[in-house]
Amino acid sequence: MKKALIFGITGQDGSYLAELLLENGYEVTGVTRRVSVNTTERIHHILPKITIAEGDITDGFSVNKLIAEYEPDEVYNLAAQSHVGTSFKQPSLTWDITAGGVLNILEAIRYSPRKDDIRFYQASSSEMFGKNFDEGFSSKGISIDMKYQDENTEFIPQSPYAIAKLAAHHLVRNYREGYGIHGSCGILFNHESERRGENFVTRKITKWIGEFVKWRGGNEVDFLQDDVYHTGIVASNFPKLRLGNLDAKRDWGHAEDYVNAMWLMVGQKEAGDYVIATGETYSVRDFLDIAFARVGIDDWSNLVVIDPKFYRPAEVDHLLGIPIKAEKELGWKRKVSFKDLVHRMVDSDLE
């Protein structure tokens, strides 16, 4: 039985990855920090099937101890301070977890007597590209006539989070080439799910819709039968949905599809770096259209307020990943469409 050690198991990706590994017969250990609040909500249903180990990714001694004690065949690092906006407010914390933590894992693997038997996955981010992109190409019957990012696009990070992720990305490549560590990086574009944190714009939208429907005392069917909501009229005593840049475009996929790519990477004979994306880009406005339509609201303009405080410094306004390498070498392909992703998130928050 293979053993997997997951840093960041209580997050969106960690919970889906743990489920996938359990389905494939792994012995799964998840690393959590000792905190005063319960953080295991996303993995509560699988707690009897996994081992939870206390540890701190920012503490090298703690990481060394975990690698030595649990003897993993595969190590997945999904731990990070992953909110871009928060990284501007807490850059030091973001660096310590997102970059420093990766160095601690790599050093622990490097000095482990089982170094050659351990495979490491690092969650890199499309935010590393910043505002940079390539434009237009045609290869083997595939034509892209728009701005895009792939494994060859230059990284120009625009936030403390992206800078820390890029440092970690380069560290993995350096340890792979310099010390022979089997370390792969998934350059993950935006991926959401019903388990997405409420501080992310997609979940903020679907959670608000769920609360609004419940406040009205109706449900999806009621909205479809109530024409007053099609005009965008809303009671003044219900707080409106406050958002930032509605025209920012992202390549959005479902987290379940993306954790499958992680697993496929560590199973490759040779380690490498892969863009994991859908190859489609949509704006926040597009997300709103589909989300509100799910509950029968055609005109949401009077329900949403643009609030400048949600604009970020050095805003990245366009991300579109081309996952050709992952599709060819890993045999990976996304299964959940953008529309289905939005519907699943809305439906979950309506429950």
Give, region by region, the residue ranges found by the protein language model.
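N-terminal Rossmann-like NAD(P)+-binding domain of SDR-like oxidoreductases, especially those catalyzing
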Residues: 1-191, 256, 262, 266, ...
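C-terminal substrate-binding subdomain of Rossmann-fold SDR/epimerase-dehydratase oxidoreductases
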Residues: 17-23, 30-31, 55-58, 196, ...
